[in-house]
Amino acid sequence: MMEFLMVFIISTVSAAVFTLFIRNILRSADIGDKPIVTEHSHKAGTPTMGGLGMLLALLLVTVLYRNNPYLVLTSLIVLTAAIVGLLDDLLGLKVKEVQRIIRNVSEGPLEVGQLVLKPGEEARAATDKAKRDVEALLSEGLVEVVGEAPIKNEVSEGEKILAQLLIGVFLVLSGAVGKLGGFYLGLAAAPIAIAGMVGAINAVNLIDGMDGMAAGIMLIASLSCAIFLGLSGQALPFLALAGMCAGFLVFNRHPASIFMGDTGSFALGAGYATAVMLTDTVYFGVLAIAVPVVSVIVSLLHRAGVIRLPVEPLHHTLHYRGMSERRIVLLYWLITLIVCALGLYMTGSIL
């Protein structure tokens, strides 16, 4: 028990220390976020790439507990994913284009792109259709330009998916994945493992949109997986992941003084997926991140035109409807905690 506690404590403390160090470096270099959501304009300049602090904490724990193969392989996958995320974050330091933010000054609703703006509401003209609509509405005096949003350079969606697929292939080639869901599948496990890797990375990346949301959810999920495993040697990767989330939350909770960026979200998603597949906790592992999974499904349905959100992803829609950021984050944490507690109770992991 003491070993498990020490892994969590070392990971937590080192993540907090490294994150503080990274934050100060980024501040001195004037490297900060450029929000594209109007309501988040007050966060402009907040250092990003805080995932580097989380990564350093995990690597430290891995060096100290290098005899645990589950932890070592998880760290290798995390390092690979973090490098991909870091490249995307570095590209994001340059602005690709500046998009106009407009406000509906008419007396009725207006269609701008896929959105329907009520009187007084604001939106960013992001798509080609939205830009054409704005030009027409401006000429009629129905909207006014109230600001501009810098759009960052980034790795294309196709390139991101390719990189995530390669990370999944790396895991499969390690030979550690063959049994999933209690069944030995051999090579048949490969496509499932790769799809799981891509899904987990994108799920964590999607919910990393509000202060403390991703780190808090993954802290709860990782600790729950460790408890599900009975705090055995297989639980060490989850305890290390939970600790680095806890340490990062010291500076990422509302109001956040640093963001994890794609460096952190890619690393966290890949690390969680790896730990789940290495320890064959697939069913419980997916259940534990039900909130991110549902968020991804909702976004996919929106993009497919099955449902229509005023703003994507779902948590931004809740914010758009008037719910405060802090309440949304607490709601997502609470749902995750309840789902994990029910899962642990139903599996007999807790009384």
From Swiss-Prot:
Disulfide bonds: none annotated. Signal peptide: none annotated. The keyword Transmembrane helix applies. GO terms for cellular component: plasma membrane. InterPro entries: Glycosyl_transferase_4, PNAcMuramoyl-5peptid_Trfase, PNAcMuramoyl-5peptid_Trfase_CS. Its cofactor is Mg(2+). The keyword Manganese does not apply. Its EC number is 2.7.8.13. One of its GO terms (molecular function) is metal ion binding. It is a multi-pass membrane protein. Pfam families: Glycos_transf_4 (PF00953). Keywords: Cell membrane, Magnesium, Membrane, Metal-binding, Transferase, Transmembrane, Transmembrane helix. It is found in: Cell membrane. It comes from the Archaea. It catalyses: UDP-N-acetyl-alpha-D-muramoyl-L-alanyl-gamma-D-glutamyl-meso-2,6-diaminopimeloyl-D-alanyl-D-alanine + di-trans,octa-cis-undecaprenyl phosphate = di-trans,octa-cis-undecaprenyl diphospho-N-acetyl-alpha-D-muramoyl-L-alanyl-D-glutamyl-meso-2,6-diaminopimeloyl-D-alanyl-D-alanine + UMP. GO terms for biological process: cell wall macromolecule biosynthetic process; cell wall organization. The chain crosses the membrane at residues 2-22, 44-64, 71-91, 158-178, 181-201, 212-232, 235-255, 258-278, 281-301, 328-348. It is an enzyme of class 2 (transferase). Belongs to the glycosyltransferase 4 family. MraY subfamily. HAMAP family: MraY (MF_00038). This is Putative phospho-N-acetylmuramoyl-pentapeptide-transferase. It comes from Methanothermobacter thermautotrophicus (strain ATCC 29096 / DSM 1053 / JCM 10044 / NBRC 100330 / Delta H) (Methanobacterium thermoautotrophicum).
